[in-house]
From Swiss-Prot:
Listed SMART domains: IGc1
Subcellular compartments: Cell membrane; Endosome membrane; Lysosome membrane
Domain Ig-like: 84-194
A GO MF term: lipopeptide binding
Phylogenetic lineage: Eukaryota, Metazoa, Chordata, Craniata, Vertebrata
Protein name: T-cell surface glycoprotein CD1b-3
Residue spans, topological domain Cytoplasmic: 223-232
Biological processes per GO annotation: adaptive immune response; antigen processing and presentation, endogenous lipid antigen via MHC class Ib; antigen processing and presentation, exogenous lipid antigen via MHC class Ib; positive regulation of T cell mediated cytotoxicity
Length: 232
């Protein structure tokens, strides 16, 4: 009984048990029990091991529990078979989620004016998964001091959103860029330029492409006119 171990009511017993998957796919199971906030005993290699903090009570407890091999067999089965099987099942079910990679989208905007002659540059990054991401305001290859990162916010589709801001003088904004590093991008970082460089593509689409279409239409009109005159 409890009197044999000199336990007095009331007392607090704490315990933790589980299994861990280590590198090389080795699974280590454990069970540790505490008494009154101190380490008491642990189950290792199919046997009860008293902890030094447990003193003589822990030693007597292990002697006592060893007499009941049925109890140790149940504990051993739970630790060596049931727990690892459950762990591998959970990992297998969540493998797709663990390896899930979703590329981020990024865009730039300006925030509320910090003061006269100053701009608040905002780099938005959204739709990425997993959560770890690095977003930097850069000038060339130099990361800019004063970059402020907001909280990473969970989207409705379980991807993430982040905004990173930089307060600069209006005359110093040209040439700055926002760089996004994420595991889904590999070595292909997203780089968005503030100012004119970011509009080069829009200029091409808005001016060059319509001009080409106009030239093609004129060429077709002249060709049809020439063909008609040839027939006559």
């Amino acid at each position: 009984g409890l009197q044999e171990f000199q336990f007095e009511y009331p007392f607090v017993i704490q315990g933790i048990a589980g299994c861990e998957l280590h590198s090389g796919k080795a699974i280590q199971s454990f069970l540790r029990a505490g008494f009154e906030g101190l380490d008491f005993v642990s189950i290792e290699n199919h046997s009860c091991v008293p902890e030094p903090e447990g003193g003589s009570e822990a030693q007597w407890f292990c002697v006592f529990i060893t007499q009941y091999q049925g109890i140790l067999a149940i504990i051993d089965r739970l630790l060596s078979k049931t727990c690892p099987r459950y762990l591998l099942g959970v990992l297998d079910a969540g493998k797709a989620e663990l390896h899930r990679q979703v590329k981020p989208e990024a865009w730039l905007s300006s925030g509320p004016t910090p003061g006269p002659g100053r701009l608040l540059l905002v780099c938005h990054v959204s739709g990425f998964y997993p959560k770890p991401v690095r977003v930097m305001w850069m000038r060339g290859e130099q990361e800019q001091p004063g970059t402020q990162q907001g909280n990473i916010i969970l989207n409705a589709d379980w991807t993430w959103y982040l905004r990173v801001t930089l307060d600069v003088a209006a005359g110093e904004a040209a040439g700055l860029s926002c760089r996004v590093k994420h595991s889904s991008l590999g070595d292909q970082d997203i780089i968005l330029y503030w100012g004119h460089p970011m509009y080069i593509g829009l200029i091409f689409v808005a001016i060059i492409v319509p001009s080409l279409i106009l030239l093609i239409c004129l060429a077709l009109w002249f060709w049809r006119r020439w063909s008609y005159q040839t027939v006559l």
